[in-house]
Amino acid sequence: MIFYLHGFDATSPGNHEKMRQLQFIDPDVRLISYSTLHPKHDMQYLLKEVAKQMQHSDDPAPLMVGVGLGAYWAERIGFLNGLKSVLINPNLHPENTMQGKIDRPEEYADIANKCVSEFRMKNTHKAMCILSRFDEVLESQLSADELSRYYAIEWDETQPHKFPQLAAHLPKIKAFKLG
């Protein structure tokens, strides 16, 4: 089972396409949609929804996959549920990058402060990160610098921020899920 978490653009048709591509790894791909506008509510909702979905699966190794803002949540929700996660062009600091896009971006800082201290150290090797070398939205090298001590980093030389084509990375994602 793969949980797919969309980015800030929840209605993008690319989300359906990415889910279809992920079905080459596991036919059971589940979209977990969230508001993107209310971080504290989103966190509570995502925790409850993932727990509920896991009760209805016999997969011994479910995987979280998120793109952009969805990768922010995939890392945290995956950690809190003991799941591996794949972070694609993660928005690591939405308290900064979401300024002007949502009403209370400071809620992300509050969530980060309440998260388990040093959670990435406790989550080492339980996530992999795929970064677009030419991400037009986020500074990928800063993400690599922040995450490389904890997670494997895979670079992509062609995909934009929304990462419409996962095909080149599907074998590595599958190996990570099963490994």
UniProtKB/Swiss-Prot annotation:
Cellular component, GO, one term: cytosol
Gene Ontology MF: a single term: hydrolase activity, acting on ester bonds
Domain of life: Bacteria
Similarity field: Belongs to the UPF0227 family.
Name this polypeptide is given: UPF0227 protein SO_2251
